[in-house]
Amino acid sequence: MAIERTFSIIKPDATRRNLTGAINAVIEKAGLRIVAQKRIQMTKAQAEAFYAVHSARPFFNDLVSFMTSGPVVVQVLEGEDAVAKYREVMGATNPANAAEGTIRKLFAESIEANSAHGSDSVENAGVEIAQFFSQNEIVG
């Protein structure tokens, strides 16, 4: 097992309901360390760039609108197999299919307003982290 870093976003549906601390508690209980974190208002340009892989999908504009509808908390998480571990901790994209105790089962409102984003690979984690953090902001 390797120590990895992954990228997380606590989405607007969760920040609106003041769930950052509760979500952080789930993350830390799973053995992941939060080595960088900041609350930001994502711009339309940032959201479009971040979700560019989905630009041809019918839900793209709704996704950009949602992600810019309120503050988000961007994070760098670190730990053993952090990418896979955080995806397990988040739960299935559709909260109806998420396992008990996962972030999405506990806090999500819908498949879109599902409270959290996590990188899907180590490579994408590196790209996503670099979009929001400089190296000197990551203090592990």
From Swiss-Prot:
Molecular functions per Gene Ontology: ATP binding; metal ion binding; nucleoside diphosphate kinase activity
Enzyme type, top EC level: transferase
Gene3D superfamilies recorded: Nucleoside diphosphate kinase-like domain
Required cofactor(s): Mg(2+)
Classification via CDD domains: NDPk_I
Domain of life assignment: Bacteria
InterPro entries registered for this protein in UniProt: NDK-like_dom, NDK-like_dom_sf, Nucleoside_diP_kinase, Nucleoside_diP_kinase_AS
Transmembrane segments: none
Biological process (GO), any one: CTP biosynthetic process
Localization in the cell: Cytoplasm
GO cellular component, one term: cytoplasm
Catalytic center residues: 117
Signal peptide: none
A Pfam cross-reference name: NDK
Entry's EC annotation: 2.7.4.6
Family statement: Belongs to the NDK family.
Protein name from the UniProt record: Nucleoside diphosphate kinase
Organism annotation: Azorhizobium caulinodans (strain ATCC 43989 / DSM 5975 / JCM 20966 / LMG 6465 / NBRC 14845 / NCIMB 13405 / ORS 571)
